Swiss-Prot record:
The organism of origin for this protein: Paramagnetospirillum magneticum (strain ATCC 700264 / AMB-1)
Cited InterPro entries: Enolpyruvate_Tfrase_dom (IPR001986), Enolpyruvate_Tfrase_sf (IPR036968), MurA_subfamily (IPR050068), RNA3'P_cycl/enolpyr_Trfase_a/b (IPR013792), UDP_GlcNAc_COvinyl_MurA (IPR005750)
Pfam families, A to Z: EPSP_synthase
Membrane-spanning parts: none
Highest classification ranks of the organism: Bacteria, Pseudomonadati, Pseudomonadota, Alphaproteobacteria, Rhodospirillales
Function noted in UniProt: Cell wall formation. Adds enolpyruvyl to UDP-N-acetylglucosamine.
Gene that encodes it: murA
CC per GO annotation: cytoplasm
Entry's Gene Ontology molecular function annotations: UDP-N-acetylglucosamine 1-carboxyvinyltransferase activity
Protein name as annotated: UDP-N-acetylglucosamine 1-carboxyvinyltransferase
Pathway assigned to this chain's UniProt record: Cell wall biogenesis; peptidoglycan biosynthesis
Length: 432
């Protein structure tokens, strides 16, 4: 099992290229099921979760072709063509779905186009309870018959789904994506109230419009979808990853470095940039993306509360906790989105971080210096927060179970090493 070795204490300086957003790509890929024509996606990140989704779609009968030349050593220049002309299987099996919760996003498209779907209940990072009940209740409102049997969601509908007024009792990103896709082929108008407003949902909606969907209110909390009889193919480029952007912004800050993030969308970074600015980091837009500098002055603790977009993202909480562990003074970090999302805390305390958890809040008191240690990744964002802490720590840190990291970050050690980080991947105890 791979591990990562880091010797901390070097300020990072240079440029890092930001890839396409994992969470956008994982919703865009199943959208291919809504048409028999080809959906061509560019700027796809090369990640384990993307491969898992590709394997799931292939199991349904989607044919795929990867064209174009790779740019920047990654898959930035590649175009993935997905064609769902001959779908022979509407079952999403447990062995694939258990690896990643986003697999449930095939449910809406399969049901809308084929009138049936059998999808295993989802897996992914073990962070609290992520109920798919909200997806299922909304599909029932649209006329679907839903049963749970042997760990599978069995959904069917006579004829087409019917437009409905769906009001989500709480904001759900996956639920909004599933119902948005299903509604494009439903009969009549669907209104999705209390819809999630994440940029990845805007990206999905704009791709669906490019495929012939009729959607109003994109980017707002109320989406109106006028169903059409069929969608067609399209070419679409995945939005840059705001979480990857934020993570490398914190890498610059925590090492007191200076990094330009090429390809970053500055307009999607408002909540993260506000927090970074408040704690003393200099953030500015550049013609190529954004620049983050923390090589002058000190970092001070600030309070953070995670919220649905446009609030501070839950997927940046662990990274900011690492930064606050090195800041002057105290900060309070409150997690309102997911339960059980402080699994990185015991590992950070092994490195000398001073963190006390009280329910859904963590009090972080900045430590004079973190020190290297053997630590273990428990989930995707926790794993990268340990890498960030290690970059700032004195001495050597070994991060174990980095397969979590590969689910969400493309070539992380390569990108950091290019900015001066002393970092290497170890395979079975030896350097690659």
């Amino acid at each position: 099992m791979d591990r990562i070795r880091i010797v901390g204490g070097t300020p990072l300086k240079g440029t890092i290229t930001i890839g396409g957003a994992k969470n956008a790509a994982l919703a865009l890929m199943p959208a291919c099921l809504l048409t028999e024509e080809t959906l061509a996606l560019s700027n796809l990140p090369h990640l384990v979760d993307i491969t898992t989704m590709a394997n799931l779609l292939a199991q349904h009968g989607v044919t795929m072709a990867l064209n174009g030349d790779a740019a920047n050593g990654g898959h930035t220049g590649r175009v993935l063509e997905l064609t769902a002309a001959h779908i022979g299987n509407t079952t999403a099996p447990y062995d694939l779905v258990r690896k990643m919760r986003a697999s449930v996003l095939v449910l809406g498209p399969l049901l809308a186009r084929f009138g049936e779907a059998r999808v295993s209940l989802p897996g992914g990072c073990a962070i609290g309870t992520r109920p798919v009940d909200l997806h299922l209740k909304a599909l029932e409102q649209m006329g679907a018959k839903i049963e749970l049997d042997g760990g599978y969601i069995i959904a069917s509908v006579q004829g087409r789904l019917k437009g409905a007024h769906v009001i989500f009792p709480q904001i759900t990103v996956g639920g909004t994506e599933n119902i948005l896709m299903a509604a494009t082929l439903a009969e009549g108008e669907t209104v999705i109230a209390n819809a999630a407003r994440e940029p990845e949902i805007t990206d999905l909606a704009e791709c669906l419009v490019a495929m012939g969907a009729k959607i109003e209110g994109i980017g707002t909390g109320t989406l109106k979808v006028q169903g059409v009889e069929r969608l067609h193919g399209a070419e679409y480029s995945v939005v840059p990853d705001r979480i990857e952007t934020g993570t490398y912004a914190v890498a610059a800050a925590i090492t007191r470095g200076d990094i330009e993030l090429v390809g970053a969308r500055f307009d999607l970074m408002e909540s993260v940039n506000k927090v970074l600015t408040e704690c003393g980091v200099h953030v500015e837009e550049t013609p190529r993306g954004m620049r983050v500098r923390a090589d002058q002055g000190e970092i001070t603790g600030v309070d953070i509360m995670t919220e649905p977009y446009p609030g501070f993202p839950t997927d940046m909480q662990a990274q900011l906790m690492a930064l606050m562990s090195t800041a002057k003074g105290a900060s309070m970090i409150t997690e309102t989105i997911f339960e059980n999302r402080f699994m990185h805390v015991p590992e950070m305390t092994r490195m000398g971080a001073r963190i006390n958890v009280h329910g859904s809040s963590a009090i972080v008191r900045g430590a004079p210096k973190l020190s290297g240690a053997q630590v273990m990744a428990t989930d995707l964002r926790a794993s990268v927060s340990l890498v960030l802490a290690a970059l700032a720590a004195e001495g050597e840190t070994i991060v174990n179970r980095v397969y979590h990291l590969d689910r969400g970050y493309e070539r992380v050690e390569e990108k950091l090493a290019a900015c001066g980080a002393k970092i290497e991947r170890l395979k079975d105890g030896v350097a690659e």
